[in-house]
Design a protein with these regions (language model features):
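Acidic, His- and aromatic-enriched active-site or binding-groove loops in soluble protein domains
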Residues: 1-8, 95-101
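Loop/helix patches that line or flank the sugar-binding groove of alpha-linked glycan CAZymes
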Residues: 16-19, 26-38, 43-156
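Extracellular glycoside hydrolase catalytic/binding regions
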Residues: 2-14, 47-51
Length: 156
């Protein structure tokens, strides 16, 4: 599902590709973990992916509402982490290292000198995090989304 959503977010594929991908995972979908970012993939906000974090919001909403599968939010994703720092062995590649003793600016801003209250986030990061919060709270609190299933209208 990740590859399909990435292509759609980057305007290289139509949204109609989702139906085929969804059908392709029919037999294994109950074992799937959905994600838009992880340590192997480039950050949505990076120059190597979409260039802006907001571009991933529709993908997050879709994944979170697709079925009852868990959705992974990767370290700083909800803050719009760009992954464009030259850290350790990684270099500037749109990813964030899991191997180096290094910290991301977005996480430091969230940690706010140990208060862990987001006190140093900028307005854009706060608004972006709020979008994530709204979507994830809706999915967890709305019974039809939290426990429901769906049937695609384009299913064939």
């Amino acid at each position: 599902m990740y590859d399909t959503l990435r292509e759609i977010i980057c305007h290289r594929a139509p949204t109609t590709d989702i139906s085929a991908r969804w059908q392709a995972i029919e037999e294994t979908k109950e074992h799937m973990l959905f994600f838009l970012e992880n340590h192997d993939e480039q950050r949505i906000a990076s120059d190597f992916f979409a260039g802006k974090a907001q571009a991933g919001i529709p993908g997050l909403a879709f994944m979170a509402m697709l079925d009852v599968n868990p959705v992974m939010i990767y370290n700083g994703q909800e803050l719009g982490e760009k992954g464009m720092d030259n850290e350790g062995f990684s270099g500037v590649d749109g990813r964030t290292s899991i191997f180096d003793y290094w910290s991301m600016q977005s996480i430091r801003a969230w940690a706010n000198n140990g208060l862990v209250d987001g006190g140093q986030l900028n307005d854009e990061q706060r608004a972006f995090r709020e979008s994530y919060k709204k979507i994830l709270n809706l999915v967890n609190n709305e019974k039809a989304l939290a426990r429901g299933h769906f049937y695609g209208l384009a299913y064939c």
